[in-house]
């Protein structure tokens, strides 16, 4: 990751390097062992969201990275990607597009199926969610296998948008998602990396 500073409005000093900010945020991510199943170390971002200082620092990291990038929209993946994605869109004065699980959107949709470890799932987007040529930032909370984010990328591209980058708070590189996304042509930015899954 490259060095970055935090805005003067942030509670973290402006001279802080991104590495320091990463450590600060990482310390506030709760690890819940054996949830939702035995052997999984669940990375819980809710402590970051509950604390106003941590939330401000987190949002500032994304806002500073993407301001001035000529974006038209931010798309967030159901459900935790909605939280960060909508705040970042607001801060950048952009619209927000939800990418939902199948059957949750009321208007005409475009769907994309993706593989899970034992089966498949589908995400959808409204058919009028973006226009050809739109430059879109795609956000989720965590990158594990990368399947959901890759499906979101394909949906946006089918509508003619360019996905400028995928972004998440947490990367679990051992699960292969970040490699899958980058190999699939999606540049990726994550704030924290954790070993295991």
Curated annotation (Swiss-Prot):
Transmembrane segments: none annotated. It is an enzyme of class 2 (transferase). It comes from the Bacteria. Its EC number is 2.4.2.7. It holds the Pfam family Pribosyltran. It catalyses: AMP + diphosphate = 5-phospho-alpha-D-ribose 1-diphosphate + adenine. It is found in: Cytoplasm. One of its GO terms (molecular function) is adenine phosphoribosyltransferase activity. NCBIfam families: apt, PRK02304.1-3, PRK02304.1-5. Belongs to the purine/pyrimidine phosphoribosyltransferase family. This is Adenine phosphoribosyltransferase.
């Amino acid at each position: 990751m490259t060095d970055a500073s935090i805005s003067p409005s942030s509670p973290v000093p402006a001279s802080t390097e991104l590495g320091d900010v990463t450590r600060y945020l990482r310390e506030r991510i709760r690890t819940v062992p054996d949830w939702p199943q035995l052997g999984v170390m669940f990375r819980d971002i809710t402590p970051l969201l509950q604390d106003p200082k941590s939330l401000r620092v987190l949002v500032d990291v994304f806002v500073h990275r993407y301001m001035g990038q000529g974006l038209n929209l931010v798309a967030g993946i159901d459900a935790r990607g909605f939280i960060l994605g909508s705040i970042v869109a607001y801060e950048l004065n952009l619209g927000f597009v939800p990418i939902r699980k199948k059957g949750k959107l009321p208007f005409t949709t475009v769907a994309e199926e993706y593989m899970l470890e034992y089966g498949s799932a589908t995400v959808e987007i409204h058919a009028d969610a973006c226009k050809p040529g739109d430059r879109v930032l795609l956000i989720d909370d965590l990158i594990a296998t990368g399947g959901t984010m890759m499906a979101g990328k394909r949906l946006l591209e089918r509508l003619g948008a360019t996905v400028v980058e995928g972004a998440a708070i947490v990367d679990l590189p051992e699960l292969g998602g970040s490699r899958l996304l980058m190999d699939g042509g999606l540049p990726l930015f994550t704030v924290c990396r954790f070993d295991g899954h």
